[in-house]
Amino acid sequence: VDFSRLSDGQKSMLYLSLVLTSQSIYHSVRNSEDNSFDIEKLRPPIFALIALEEPENSLSPHYLGRVIEALKQTTQHNDAQAIIATHSPAMLRRVSPEHIRYLRLNGLRTTMIRMICLPDKSDDAHKFVREAIQAFPEIYFSRLVVLGEGDSEEIVLPRILSAKGVPVDSSAITIAPLGGRHVNHFWRLLSQLEIPHITLLDLDVARFGGGWGRIKYANDQLKKFEPEKILPDN
């Protein structure tokens, strides 16, 4: 097939395949697994930096997954690193939070760079927070995050906000039902990323652990995170 007849996605995949294949050949020759090439003439690079800009513009989500897996295999060696710039939740869902670097413009129009800080691995909250972040990667692109209790908020809140003239998608609002668990870790994460957020709590008297205990739990967590914002004793 003539190169000019390929789509943008196919051209991207072809170019990336050539780069990754050349890296694979370098590794095979260097490790004496392939004698078809003379390493002196091949002259493999000491270090390769593979940069992809918004691959989601021309590739389907399933191809994105294949690209990430191929890059992971290539970067297992110490002679290559991959950087992907993306606005796609589908891409972030396939990447561990520890490998994400969050870029955002501040009020001075200067780019700030943040790492994703998770609870300590020995903490029970680590797994929950990690899975929640991967389940709702939209939070990285949000102007406002609403931390809700259950699935009903995902149905009701968008309709209420739309009726008030604040469409969820147009306003870049993400509603994340977390069941009220480990809210302090999400407060810390969102505050670090400078993403505005609101926490909704309901009494849920009929549920185990419900009632005013829910409010007390959130207030106790707030005392650890931002003591100046806790509820007054009276």
State what each model feature region is.
Residues 2-135:
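Switch/communication elements of ASCE P-loop NTPase nucleotide-binding domains
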Residues 101-234:
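Acidic, divalent-metal-binding catalytic cores of TOPRIM
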